[in-house]
């Protein structure tokens, strides 16, 4: 479960209640550290990101994170429902495991996230044979709004999330 809380400040948190650990750790991607994406090249300039991840081969596989602008994002189980597309021409193709850093590296608000998602394709490229595709849906929030993003068989869907909560 992930939830947001707004008082005079904005808070976002989530539970990661597995019975075992994947080697989770706090991961920090510094501002402007070169970030390579499988189909979208390397971003040389981007926002700083901090979150929980399994780091494999030096790459942070973020479960949840927040960027320096206050946009937070968490991936939660969506088993049996999630489906990712094949790579397509004329759109930005982002692998499922890259989704959190792709969004948080360049969006300063949920409004910017919506714009970025309008020309993005979430694809079925796994990180490696040892790390198959995770079946997830996501909550993305800032101090003004929350959305839920789900990739299913008929494409990417974006829903307003006025309560700022997402469950498995």
Report residues per predicted region:
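Short, low-complexity, polar/charged sequence segments that are solvent-exposed and flexible
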Residues: 30-34, 92-94, 157-160, 167
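Alpha/propeptide regions of enzymes that mature by internal proteolysis
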Residues: 90-123
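A contiguous strand-loop segment
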Residues: 1-91, 124
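Extended amphipathic alpha-helical segments with heptad-repeat/coiled-coil character used for oligomerization
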Residues: 131-168
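Preference for long, solvent-exposed alpha-helical segments and helix-linker "stalks"
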Residues: 119, 125, 165-168
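Conserved catalytic-core segments centered on acid/base and nucleophilic motifs
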Residues: 2-4, 73, 102-106, 116-117, ...
């Amino acid at each position: 479960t992930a939830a947001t809380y707004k008082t005079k400040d904005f808070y976002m948190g989530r539970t990661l209640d597995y019975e075992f650990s994947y080697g989770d750790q706090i991961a920090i991607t510094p501002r402007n550290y070169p970030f390579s994406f499988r189909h979208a090249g390397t971003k040389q300039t981007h926002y700083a990101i901090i979150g929980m991840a399994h780091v494999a081969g030096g790459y942070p596989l973020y479960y949840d994170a927040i960027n320096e602008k206050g946009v937070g994002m968490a991936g939660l189980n969506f088993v049996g429902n999630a489906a990712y597309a094949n790579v397509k021409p004329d759109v930005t193709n982002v692998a499922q495991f890259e989704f959190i850093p792709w969004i948080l590296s360049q969006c300063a608000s949920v409004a910017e996230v919506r714009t970025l998602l309008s020309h993005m394709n979430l694809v079925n490229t796994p990180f490696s044979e040892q790390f198959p595709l995770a079946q997830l849906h996501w909550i993305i929030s800032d101090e003004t709004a929350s959305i839920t993003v789900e990739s299913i068989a008929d494409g990417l869907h974006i829903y307003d999330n006025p309560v700022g909560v997402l469950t498995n």
